[in-house]
Each structure stands twice: as C-alpha cells, then as structure tokens.
Amino acid sequence: MNRVILYCRPGFEKECAAEITEKATQHDAYGFARVKENSGYVVFECYQHEDAERLVKTLPFHELIFARQMFVSGELLRDLPPEDRITPIVGMLSGAIERAGELRVEVPDTNESKELMKFCRKFTVPLRAALREHKILLGYEKADRPVLHVLFIAPGCCYVGYSYSNNNSPFYMGIPRLKFPSDAPSRSTLKLEEAFHVFIPADEWDERLGSGMYAVDLGACPGGWTYQLVKRSMMVYAVDNGPMAPSLMETGQVMHHQADGFRFEPPRNNVYWLVCDMVEKPAKVTSLMSDWLIKGWCREAIFNLKLPMKKRYEEVSHNLAVLQERLSENGINAEVHAKHLYHDREEITVHVRRFWSAVPGRRDER
C-alpha cells in the first residue's frame, strides 16, 4: 500500500494536494499527488511503499488544514464483479491489517456520489461479516484499533485501506453530523459548533466551554456564533453595529455593543473566549486576533479567515506563519490549529489556545 487518500471539500483538491506534498516532504516522504477537479478527494502516491503507512501514522492529522480524512491505501480496485465485490476487498486487506476496530464504507462528498451512498449502506453489512470472518475486523467496535476505509469513487471502483484511530477524523466521511437548531438566528451557528467538535476534546468541554464564562463575539450580528455561546450558559459581549436576534437578547446573557469590532476593547479582564466571523481581509483579521492574544484579552480564540480566489493555500500558510511569529516574538506560548470545516465555504477556521499570560512571569489558569 503506497497511497495516502485524503478527503476534502470539492473544489479544494489543489489546496489539499499542495498541503500533503509539503507536509510529506517535511517528513522525508516523497511522491506526487493525483488530482481530479471537484472530485472531493486527493491521492498522494509515495515512491517508497513504506512511506504511505508511515505518513498516516506519524503525520499529525490535526496539522492538515484542507483534509477531512486520511488513510493509507493500495491501488484502485476497478470493475469489481457485481456478483462478488467482497473477495477483492478482503484480498487487498489480508496481510495488511488485522483486528481493526471499525469499518467505514464511504463516498466523496459530491452530488454525483449520493446514489452510491445508498449502495454503501447496504454493502456495509455483508462486507463487515466477511471481514470479521477473516479476522481483519474485530467482532465488535473498538475505538483504539485501526479503522478500515472503503472509498467508492464510482460503481465497482474503490480505494481500500485503513487509518489509525489516534490520528484520523472520528467522523464518517470526516464530516460531523450536526443538526441546525430551529431557534438559531443563522446557519453560521453550525460553523462554531463544528469548530468546538473538531478543536476541543469532548472530555474537556466542561472545563473549556463551561457555564458562567465570559466571551466576546466580534461581528456578531445577527447572532449565529453568539447563539452557541449562550447555549453553553456563557455571558457574551456581542459586538456589531447591526441588530442582534431578539431571542438572544431576551436571555439576559448578551450585552450588545454597537461598535466597530476592530476598535472594541473588552470591559473586563476575565474574558475566556474570543470568536470572530467578520468578512474582512485575512491579514487584517489575523492582526486583530494577534493583538487580543498578545494583550491577554482572551485565552482561547476561534475565528474565520476568508480565502482569496487564487493561491488559497499560500495565503493561509502566510497568515498562520505571521500569527505564530507575532505570538512567539511576544513570549506567548500557544497552540494554533486551522481547519477547512465542512460548514466553511471560501474560508478556514482557526483555533488558538494561549497557555502563558501576556504578563511576564504569570501562568494562565486553565
């Protein structure tokens, strides 16, 4: 198995390919990316067979911005016989992996693949039984074992392989299944909810998304992101010249400041969260977020960077490098992660967690 398969949003295959090529080189793995426009996936073919396995094991998945999922695979299985599609798949996995903990039969996230999805659901049951019979898959789901992936890109054509449960997306097709809350002011609320799922471990939600925290939402109108904070019983400073949804104001948890998000300063020094989804140039938003973190005005931040039409990966890389550099220059110890979320379009979402205070010698409380 010498291929790494990566899922992405259709239309972002070039960015995904550029990223995996760069990251692989940094891990001394060399190869080339096969890209088909609007296909929703990228195939990175390694020159050395063992490099693909090594990449999916050691290249931190959370460092990849444009990939929704990543697994090691062999060559494309073509023209699977309708009377027996299972045997070639079992043959591909035999000797490559054993005692996996989960099976996912998936398709790319495209309109063309919707019909294939129906087949995948039906096919999963007999395939799971066969893989268990051959000891490739355990008789029960086990979260700490590898995950088997079968990606159908067309009827009778699939990539077959596996990922490691500690270095992949835990979601089917790499997409969190979130339901739009009927009382939310806008669909943008799903961006922040997905960001919480992607960036913050579930067992830390009570600590880092807890009741009674103070948060600031810059560019809040009409309140899609504020809604997520209010739902978690936070007190929110919503900053926007536009109107907020009356339903949010009625909670008593929202203080609406009709002001410019680039000029607003927090009225208290115990703000934990800063969130921002303003339609502005990425460099301008990056600079603003850096200022807040350096001044110690927040401890964690989630914000969106709108992408240009061309050189999107280069623009993202540049802004993240500038952010890291500014934090480092000011002695701020922080984790920075970015992801092109399912609910993002021409934008990426960035999460920053600051560990050290802007005040010298004082460590932030967790």
Curated annotation (Swiss-Prot):
Subcellular localization: Cytoplasm
Catalytic reaction annotation: cytidine(2498) in 23S rRNA + S-adenosyl-L-methionine = 2'-O-methylcytidine(2498) in 23S rRNA + S-adenosyl-L-homocysteine + H(+)
One MF annotation (Gene Ontology) recorded for this entry: S-adenosylmethionine-dependent methyltransferase activity
Example of a GO biological process term: methylation
Keyword hit for Cytoplasm: yes
Active site: 306 (proton acceptor)
Name of the protein: Ribosomal RNA large subunit methyltransferase M
Gene designation: rlmM
